[in-house]
């Protein structure tokens, strides 16, 4: 019995399968990391919209992702509520 009983392409296929598995695992980890980072960024933006420096921002999810599409009435109400008042 010699060491070279199997064909040489078996080793190449094994290496390719291992590389694909590593790449898939890396993509999964990268995707989770990006998702968590975006969640953290959107959470800080939501906090800024509640407690801003004098000017409140529109909540991103409220305006763009409602169940029936963009809610124009709610957006208009927010725009008029956030308009700067003139002090004289």
Swiss-Prot record:
Gene that this polypeptide is encoded by: Snn
UniProt organism field: Rattus norvegicus (Rat)
Transmembrane portions of the chain: 11-31
Membrane-topology annotation of the record: Single-pass membrane protein
Regulation: induction: By trimethyltin (TMT), a trialkyltin compound which is a potent neurotoxic agent that selectively damages specific brain regions.
Primary subcellular site in the record, as a coarse category: mitochondrion
Mitochondrial intermembrane side: 1-10
Tissue distribution: High level of expression in spleen, followed by brain and kidney.
Residue list for modification Phosphoserine: 49, 83
Cytoplasmic topological intervals: 32-88
Family: Belongs to the stannin family.
UniProt subunit comment: Monomer.
GO CC annotations on file: cytoplasm; membrane; mitochondrial outer membrane
InterPro entries, alphabetized: SNN_cytoplasm, SNN_linker, SNN_transmemb, Stannin, Stannin_sf
Keywords: Membrane, Mitochondrion, Mitochondrion outer membrane, Phosphoprotein, Transmembrane, Transmembrane helix
Domain of life: Eukaryota
Function of the protein: Plays a role in the toxic effects of organotins. Plays a role in endosomal maturation.
Protein name, as recorded: Stannin
Subcellular location: Mitochondrion outer membrane
GO molecular function ontology, one term from the record: metal ion binding
